[in-house]
């Protein structure tokens, strides 16, 4: 089964960095996406806020470059996590994050 998602947007919440009891670093943030997409010949506004998590020592360098307002493209897979309130939420598990150059 295929499970791939590529989403570009802006980091809209301060990244939360933690280390698991087994020593694996994790970085969580929320990505806000806004765009215009074409559907059935019509333009429509597309908008979402997607929780993102990236894990592992090999990703530490990029996670320390991410701040609120950073424009990024995230590639990975989606999975459901159960929130503290008992509700399920979809989360993008990042395998690659690229900073988007603002052109400044």
Swiss-Prot record:
It comes from the Bacteria. Pfam families: SSB_1 (PF22657). InterPro entries: NA-bd_OB-fold (IPR012340), Primosome_PriB/ssb (IPR000424), Prisomal_replication_PriB (IPR023646). Belongs to the PriB family. This is Replication restart protein PriB. PROSITE patterns: SSB. Residues 1-101 form the SSB domain. GO terms for biological process: DNA replication, synthesis of primer. One of its GO terms (cellular component) is primosome complex. Homodimer. Interacts with PriA and DnaT. Component of the replication restart primosome. Primosome assembly occurs via a 'hand-off' mechanism. PriA binds to replication forks, subsequently PriB then DnaT bind; DnaT then displaces ssDNA to generate the helicase loading substrate. It comes from Enterobacter sp. (strain 638). The keyword Transcription regulation does not apply.
């Amino acid at each position: 089964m295929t499970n791939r998602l590529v989403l570009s947007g802006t980091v809209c919440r301060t990244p939360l960095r933690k280390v698991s009891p087994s020593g694996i670093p994790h970085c969580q943030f929320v990505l806000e996406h806004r765009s215009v997409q074409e559907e059935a010949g019509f333009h429509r506004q597309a908008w979402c806020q997607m929780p993102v998590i990236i894990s592992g020592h090999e990703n530490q360098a990029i996670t320390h470059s991410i701040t609120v307002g950073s424009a990024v493209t995230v590639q990975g897979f989606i999975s459901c996590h159960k929130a503290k309130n008992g509700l399920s939420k979809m989360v993008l598990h990042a395998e690659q994050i690229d900073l988007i150059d603002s052109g400044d």
